[in-house]
Every structure is written in C-alpha cells, then in structure tokens.
C-alpha cells in the first residue's frame, strides 16, 4: 500500500508541476503533506518534515552563498573576457553558441560539482542567449545533459556511492565506463548541434560586436583592476571544493565575504549588491527547503523503501541473467523517484546480491547503475537543478518537458555503447 501511495504521490506531483497547475515550490510542500495524512502519518509529520529540512540545510546554505558569490563575480566583470572570447568565436551564430554551451559545461563539470558547473556555465552563457534572443530552455537543457554525463566521474557523488555501497575500486567501476562516457559526450554535442540548428533557423546568424553588452547601470560595478584577484580567488575556491578543504557551505561563505569586502568595501554598496541577488537566492533556497519537506516525508513514511522493494520484486527470475541491462534501464526511474543515497545504498546492494546468484559480478551491476544519471538530474529531489532553472529563468516543469527525451536518449546511447563494448553484458 505504501509503495502504491508513493508512486501515486510522485505521479500527482509531476502532473501538477508539468501542467503548471502548481509551482514546484508549492507542490513540494503540499503534495507530500496530503499523501502523508492519507497514509495515517499525521502524528509524526512535523518530525519528518523538520528532519528533511535539517538534512538539506547545508545544501541550502551552500547554494545561498554560492549564488551571492558568483553574483559578485558577475557584477565585477570577472566573466566579461570569457564572454568576449566566446563572442569572437561564435560570431552571433546560435548553433555555435549551443555547441559551445555543451563543451563549456562538460569542461567545468570535471570539478565534480553540479552547483559550480551551473553557476559558471549560466553566468558565462546567459548574456549571449539574451543578446541573441535564444530559448533559455536550450541553455538549461544542454547544461543539464552535459552535467549528467560528467556526473559519473570518480570524485562525483554517484560513483563514490557505488564504490562505498558495493565495496569496489575505481578501476573496477569507472575506468571501464570511460568509452560509454565518451559516447555520452558525443551525444550531448550532437544534441547541442540539433538544438542550435533549430535556433539558427528561427533567429538566423545575428551580427553582434565582440564585447559584452554595455549596461549603463552595470558599468560602475565593474572592477577591472581586481580582475586577477577575482580570478585567483575563484580558482582557489574551485581547488578547495575539489580537495574538500572545508565543508562546502563554509567555503562559499568565506569566499563571498572576501569577494564582497574587496570588490565593494563601502557598506552601502555591499547592501545593494546583496539586495540585487537576494531574489534569485531566495527562489533557489526556498525550493531546496521545500524539497526537504518532500524528501523528509518520502523517507520518514518509508514510502521510498516500499517503492524500491516493489520495483525490485517486479523483475522476474527468468530475467536474472539480464540484470546488468535491466539495472541500466531501471536506474532511470529509480534515481528519478528517489535520492542517490536511497538508490545506491538501499536498492543497489539488493540488485547486486540477486545478480550474484547468476554469476554476475557486482562491478558490472555498479557500472550499469550509473548509466541513468542523466535522467536523475531532472528529479525534483536534486537541489542543483533548482539553481539551474532559477539562474536560467525558466520554470522547472518546462525544463523537464523540454529535456526529458534528450536525457533518456543520453542514457540509451551510453547503455548501447556499454553493451557493444562489453562494459555490461546483455
């Protein structure tokens, strides 16, 4: 019964936001509360919700100060030279801009953190999309697809969870996946080409100069004399993120404080800069805490466990020898409907144990489980996706509708490549 309620809750939630009946923020709060009450968990509801919000508090704090930090960097003109370089290359061609978005996203994604990837990519590319009148859903979609493929690098979250859950080594899981990952990269570039070609057909090639657009209000905020300082500060921040020098919220809080103090030493200026980015920060962070309500109820009611076991039980014994392929396919809905932690620590060991009865190595199941990551990033349970849509200025539901077929296509392409090369067996 819990499993059925869990699936119905997810379906209702998806319908409400994709049909624009409710905003994602309201749906994340109201829908799980209603279903928890129907399930008879009214007495424990408060504790579940607070636990969910508490679990996501560090993420919310990190995103708040990350938005403020990169907002200061944009105001100061840190990304202006990069935008000028990109402009000189793309020459007002939407196709080149779309492909450039894919390449930039996947390059930055090497740091293993989706938040910084979206921050830098959107900060660099959004002005170009605005100047040419390109569809921002193309920007958000390509950025998410690129991040989805690169999300399986060893220092990213999913692969680390697989290694910990199944007690495996990087050489057993990630190294064999590299050819499939390359296939995914080529697919994302191909998708960017297709979407860019559509935008070129709609808009044409537009003649623009090679300098970032001049906004009279933005000019006084530029800090060309501090360009190198801001660049070094950002590089140091990225290095600290990769090496986990300090917790992410602390790193972004510290970097923001230093950036604001150096670039805008006047207290009134500091207040204006914070106010200028407060709206964007509020939109994203409120969504994260609302997602905490959703995940808290999903976990606290044990709906997520019931959903996992019911899905695993649907796999017939006759399909046992094909578990690697089945795992690759079901990793899409599994990681969409539940968090990576729930899937990789709760469901994956069960699948791996079942596969061992058919002589299938746990490493093969681990590799297969990572192929659904491009779809996972469309889940309402992924905080960084709210940052992406917030910065790009698109609705969560529209982003899902626009990107879902391309995300599923990414998983299919990577799975076919994995089968052909022998990374996973049929």
Curated annotation (Swiss-Prot):
Pfam families: CitMHS. One of its GO terms (molecular function) is citrate transmembrane transporter activity. GO terms for biological process: citrate metabolic process; transmembrane transport. Keywords: Cell membrane, Citrate utilization, Membrane, Symport, Transmembrane, Transmembrane helix, Transport. It is a multi-pass membrane protein. It is found in: Cell membrane. InterPro entries: Cit_transptr-like_dom, Citrate_transporter. One of its GO terms (cellular component) is plasma membrane. It comes from the Bacteria. The chain crosses the membrane at residues 1-21, 22-42, 59-79, 86-106, 137-157, 176-196, 232-252, 278-298, 318-338, 343-363, 377-397, 406-426. Its main location: membrane. Belongs to the CitM (TC 2.A.11) transporter family. Transports the free citrate anion. Probably cotransports citrate and at least three or four protons. The citrate uptake is inhibited by the presence of magnesium ions. This is Citrate transporter. It comes from Bacillus subtilis (strain 168).
């Amino acid at each position: 019964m819990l499993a059925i309620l869990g699936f119905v809750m997810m379906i209702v939630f998806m319908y409400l936001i994709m049909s624009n009946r409710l905003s994602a923020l309201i749906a994340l709060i109201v829908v799980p509360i209603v279903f928890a009450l129907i399930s008879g968990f009214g007495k424990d509801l408060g504790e579940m919700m607070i636990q969910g919000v508490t679990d996501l508090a560090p993420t919310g704090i990190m995103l708040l100060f990350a938005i403020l930090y990169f907002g200061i960097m944009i105001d100061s003109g840190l990304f202006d030279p990069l935008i000028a370089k990109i402009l000189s290359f793309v020459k007002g061609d939407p196709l080149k801009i779309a492909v450039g978005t894919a390449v930039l996203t996947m390059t930055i994604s090497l740091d293993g953190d989706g938040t910084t990837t979206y921050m830098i990519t959107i900060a660099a590319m959004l002005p170009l999309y605005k100047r040419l009148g390109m569809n921002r859903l193309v920007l958000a979609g390509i950025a998410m697809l690129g991040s989805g493929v690169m999300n399986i690098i060893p220092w990213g979250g999913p692969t680390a969870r697989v290694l910990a859950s199944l007690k495996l080594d990087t050489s057993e899981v990630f190294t064999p996946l590299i050819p499939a990952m390359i296939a995914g990269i080529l697919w994302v570039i191909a998708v960017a080409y297709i979407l860019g070609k559509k935008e070129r057909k709609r808009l044409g090639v537009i003649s623009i100069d090679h300098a970032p657009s001049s906004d009279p209000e933005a000019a006084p905020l530029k800090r060309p004399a501090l360009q190198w300082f801001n660049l070094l500060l950002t590089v140091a921040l990225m290095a600290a993120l990769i090496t986990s020098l300090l917790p992410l919220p602390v790193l972004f809080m510290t970097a923001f404080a230093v950036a604001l103090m150096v670039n805008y030493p006047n207290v009134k200026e500091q207040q204006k800069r914070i106010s200028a980015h407060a709206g964007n920060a509020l939109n994203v962070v409120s969504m994260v805490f609302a997602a905490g309500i959703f995940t808290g109820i999903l976990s606290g009611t044990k709906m997520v466990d019931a959903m996992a076991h019911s899905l695993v039980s649907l796999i017939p014994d006759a399909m046992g020898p094909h578990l690697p392929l089945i795992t690759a396919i079901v990793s899409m809905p599994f990681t969409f409907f539940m968090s990576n932690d729930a899937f990789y620590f709760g469901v994956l060991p069960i699948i791996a144990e079942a596969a061992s009865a058919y002589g299938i190595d746990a490493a093969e199941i681990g590799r297969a489980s990572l192929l659904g990551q491009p779809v996972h990033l469309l889940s309402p349970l992924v905080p960084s996706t709210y940052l992406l849509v917030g910065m790009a200025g698109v609705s969560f539901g529209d982003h899902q509708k626009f990107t879902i077929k391309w995300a599923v296509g990414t998983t299919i392409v990577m799975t076919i490549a994995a089968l052909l090369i022998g990374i996973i067996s049929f």
